[in-house]
Amino acid sequence: MIAFTPSAGLRSLKVASVLKRALAQLFIREFYDLSSMLSISGVKVSEDTRNATVFVAIGDKSVDGDEVVAALNDASNSIRRAVFRYLKLRYVPRLHFKLDVEFDNFLRISEIMATTK
């Protein structure tokens, strides 16, 4: 029988919260040109806290979101090293950036609902 250990799930949630704050501070302080056009909408950390998926929302619609995410993924090792300075963790998870499209989907659905009324 497999026993559920709530501490493992709780640990990944705590790491995700701390990682989200550290990434936000890093983008504000060191990557100021990026911080004005993107925001971190969420961080999901694996149960073993070795990998983290960072969901990024692009505020500026003139910028291609896929290019920004590709650039962030290319620089993920240097971003990870910079995040290490902000965190007091033994191991900083590997960062994988993804474009967050939930807000765009919400806007599209609300526009459709507004036109049907």
From Swiss-Prot:
For this chain, the annotated S-S bridges are: none
Extract the SUPFAM superfamilies matched here: Ribosome-binding factor A, RbfA
Q: Which PROSITE patterns match?
A: RBFA
Q: Name one GO molecular function term.
A: ribosomal small subunit binding
GO biological process entries: maturation of SSU-rRNA
Q: What is its main location?
A: cytoplasm
Function of this protein?
One of several proteins that assist in the late maturation steps of the functional core of the 30S ribosomal subunit. Associates with free 30S ribosomal subunits (but not with 30S subunits that are part of 70S ribosomes or polysomes). Required for efficient processing of 16S rRNA. May interact with the 5'-terminal helix region of 16S rRNA.
UniProt family annotation: Belongs to the RbfA family.
Tell me what this protein is called.
Answer: Ribosome-binding factor A
